[in-house]
Amino acid sequence: MKSLIDKAIHGDMDSDRHLISIFAMALASRGKVFIELGVREGHTTEPLYEAAKLVGAHLWSVDLNDPTKYKPNNGNYTFVKQDSIKFLEQWPKDKKIDVAFVDDWHSYPHVKRQLEFLDELVGPSSIILMHDLMYGNTDPFYHVDLSHHEGQWASGGPYRAVAELNPQFWEWSTLPWNNGLTILRKKYSNKYHRR
């Protein structure tokens, strides 16, 4: 816990100020199934993994590349070297995800597709944490630039994918610092999972 606090106070990575929040939400969920889509160095893996150990959950971290700094090598953790869309396509539909952290490829079509899959894999007690709705130093404002037509931020990026969700079924709020950490929740649909 001390290392998470130190990174949250003194860290200069683009998600360091969210590490305690990620840990607290995963811990409070008391869920059993955590997934992390996008790993890079493994900075956000650490709070998810530490919470998973404490509540007896399992964390699946998914990325095309191996983590460069933090990768647990014991129980409660599985690293999957795969595209996140393929991973979600293969996830058992009857296995509810309690906590999902989404921070990999940020293009609008990619994030929209992730959310379409997650819609079937989460229930009303699940949370989806999304990083970078305020990327590029736009915080505390959402990054709504539609001028990127190619690459990672194409077509409106993650903000557009979230902003287009039907508010009748979804609610969300964003912590407005360090590129934003959005907390997304499916309100009441029990079409796939009751809790």
What are these regions (language model features)?
Residues 1-101, 105-195:
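A short alpha-helical cap/connector motif
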